[in-house]
């Protein structure tokens, strides 16, 4: 038999398979969710801020020093993912104002150069509104003038 020809030993009639049972209805009780494993780890941005504050460097802390501090002081961190997580955290911190670049690394971009903790974004204090005294209802004078 040539390899290009199909084998004809199969039956050409298409017999229907036995009827399937109708689809199972949704469960009445919802599935139980897995319990979360203990306390959540701090965000990468909060770890970066803590590292910069602990180093107390006036001119800002380098990315390498921040990474070294985070790995030394935080257990259970995936070292292979820390670099990309730090890049995202630096971008988020710069955008929100939590982190700023010192003048020495103003031209740097991405996760390079030095970073400092920015000044806390001071929310403008809203002036307390004075309680308005309820206005007296003015009584409408009915005009008794007749229209001529």
From Swiss-Prot:
UniProt subcellular location: Nucleus; Chromosome
UniProt tissue specificity: Sperm.
Pfam families listed in its UniProt record: Linker_histone
InterPro entries linked: H1/H5, Histone_H1/H5_H15, WH-like_DNA-bd_sf, WH_DNA-bd_sf
Role noted for this protein: Linker histones are implicated in chromatin remodeling and/or transcriptional regulation during spermiogenesis, the process of spermatid maturation into spermatozoa.
Keywords: Chromosome, Developmental protein, Differentiation, DNA condensation, DNA-binding, Nucleosome core, Nucleus, Spermatogenesis
Compositional bias of kind Basic residues: 1-35, 124-148
Domain of life of the source: Eukaryota
Protein name, per record: Sperm-specific protein PHI-2B
Residues covered by region (Disordered): 1-44, 97-148
GO MF annotations, alphabetized: DNA binding; structural constituent of chromatin
SUPFAM superfamilies linked: Winged helix' DNA-binding domain (SSF46785)
Annotated family: Belongs to the histone H1/H5 family.
Gene Ontology cellular component list: nucleosome; nucleus
All copies of domain H15, residue ranges: 40-119
GO biological process: cell differentiation; chromosome condensation; nucleosome assembly; spermatogenesis
Organism name: Mytilus californianus (California mussel)
